[in-house]
């Protein structure tokens, strides 16, 4: 098991936490992380782009003028894709970009992401981060004491005061253990775990 210093809100070491090797110390494969991040981003796409085809644009379907004898090129209706304001051929239509990756691969990628943070010395543990009230200034002061910028904070409960205190701080995000995901872990430079959240995270892989 890997031992990590547990800090208080002033950035001082108060104890040690031990992280399970099967979750925080596994070999990292960039290809697996890439596949899962790509899947997450694909699921976020709205897929709402839409253009009108010739059957959907407004206008008459009558032939504009006779086929022969005018000296002009032959022409059909005003809705032809060849004309200004006509329909679009093979234009975009609403669709879902979401696709699935096996559950075991997603779980493996999450463990790899956690392991990569520990290996890069970008994982920190704090004993508690509970806020008595919604105070953005106080939250920012704690982050400064910890020396962490661009940080993902993982909590094990619904701490409304903490979430709202962090909301306006740029490059800081607070999520619960249930929402922990590969994309957010890799997006932020630092990962800060509440000490009580460690067991919750490790428990996700033993259920």
Swiss-Prot record:
Q: Which InterPro entries match?
A: Ribosomal_uL4 (IPR002136), Ribosomal_uL4-like (IPR013005), Ribosomal_uL4_dom_sf (IPR023574)
**Entry-linked HAMAP family:** Ribosomal_uL4_B
Kindly indicate whether the keyword RNA-binding belongs to this entry.
yes
Disulfide bond residue pairs: none
**Record protein name field:** Large ribosomal subunit protein uL4
Record's SUPFAM superfamilies?
Ribosomal protein L4
Q: Where is the composition biased (Polar residues)?
A: 69-78
Check the record and name the Gene3D superfamilies matching this protein.
3.40.1370.10
Segment Disordered: which positions?
43-80
State the UniProt keywords alphabetically.
Ribonucleoprotein, Ribosomal protein, RNA-binding, rRNA-binding
Its biological purpose is as follows: One of the primary rRNA binding proteins, this protein initially binds near the 5'-end of the 23S rRNA. It is important during the early stages of 50S assembly. It makes multiple contacts with different domains of the 23S rRNA in the assembled 50S subunit and ribosome. Forms part of the polypeptide exit tunnel.
Originating organism: Desulforapulum autotrophicum (strain ATCC 43914 / DSM 3382 / VKM B-1955 / HRM2)
Its quaternary structure? Answer: Part of the 50S ribosomal subunit.
Which GO biological process annotations does it have? translation
Similarity annotation: Belongs to the universal ribosomal protein uL4 family.
């Amino acid at each position: 098991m890997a031992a990590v210093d547990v800090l208080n809100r002033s950035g001082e070491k108060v104890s040690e936490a031990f992280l399970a090797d099967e979750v925080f110390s596994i070999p990292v494969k960039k290809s697996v992380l890439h596949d899962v991040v790509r899947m997450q981003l694909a699921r976020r796409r709205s897929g709402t782009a839409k253009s009108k085809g010739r059957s959907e644009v407004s206008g008459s379907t009558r032939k504009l003028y006779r086929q022969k004898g005018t000296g002009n090129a032959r022409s059909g209706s005003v809705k032809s894709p060849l004309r200004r304001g006509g329909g679009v051929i093979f234009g975009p239509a609403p669709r879902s970009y979401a696709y699935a990756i096996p559950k075991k691969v997603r779980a493996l990628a999450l463990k790899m992401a956690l392991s990569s943070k520990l290996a890069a010395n970008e994982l920190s543990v704090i004993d508690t981060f509970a806020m008595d009230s919604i105070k953005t200034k106080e939250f920012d002061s704690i982050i400064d004491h910890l020396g962490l910028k661009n940080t993902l904070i993982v909590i094990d409960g619904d701490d409304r005061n903490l979430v709202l205190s962090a909301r306006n701080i740029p490059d800081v995000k607070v999520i619960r253990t249930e929402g922990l995901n590969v994309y957010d872990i890799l997006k932020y430079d630092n990962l800060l775990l509440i000490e009580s959240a460690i067991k919750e995270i490790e428990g996700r892989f033993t259920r």
